[in-house]
From Swiss-Prot:
It comes from Yersinia pestis. InterPro entries: LpoB, Membr_lipoprot_lipid_attach_CS. Keywords: Cell outer membrane, Cell shape, Lipoprotein, Membrane, Palmitate, Peptidoglycan synthesis, Signal. One of its GO terms (molecular function) is enzyme regulator activity. One of its GO terms (cellular component) is periplasmic side of cell outer membrane. This is Penicillin-binding protein activator LpoB. Gene3D superfamilies: ABC-type transport auxiliary lipoprotein component.
Amino acid sequence: MKRYLSLALAALVLTGCVPPDSVTPTPPVTIEPVTPPDVEVPPPVDTVPQPPKVQSIDWAVSVEPLVAQMVNSDEVATGSILLVDSVKNNTNGALQTAKATAALHQVLSSNKKFVLISPQQLGVAKQTLGLSEEDSFGSRSKAIGLARYVGAQYVLYSDVSGDVKSPTIEMQLMQTQTGEIIWSGNAPVQY
């Protein structure tokens, strides 16, 4: 048994010995990192959204034909006192109704059929009644009540309705004493 053991030990020792010729050392491999080429990245550009295009409404052209129809009405006496109610916006968007009211005043004042209640008189009357200058009458009955207070014989009630891109202006001329609508008309708004 000693013999087998010494033989096995000799075999292990001999297998561990390798002649120096057969093993060639390999040089260490150096890996160089690859650098990507420098690409200049432009700074991010903040794009400003374009504002919506606001179409300018020519209110004077829009109201002139309606005023001409109203003035030619047989129901209205020349020299009558008229209160022009501010134009209401009943569209699905924003409109410059103050410009519409100013254009309506301008077109009516160039026509001598009515004597207009001035914006200053209207302001004083509103202040006396406890209303602010910016208050619109909101309803026909309030407009008629204010017209009675300032001594007007007629009230012109106007509103713009429909789609804001193609609105329609409607006007109603009412007698102050009875509230009767003696003339009404409507027309598309002109851009």
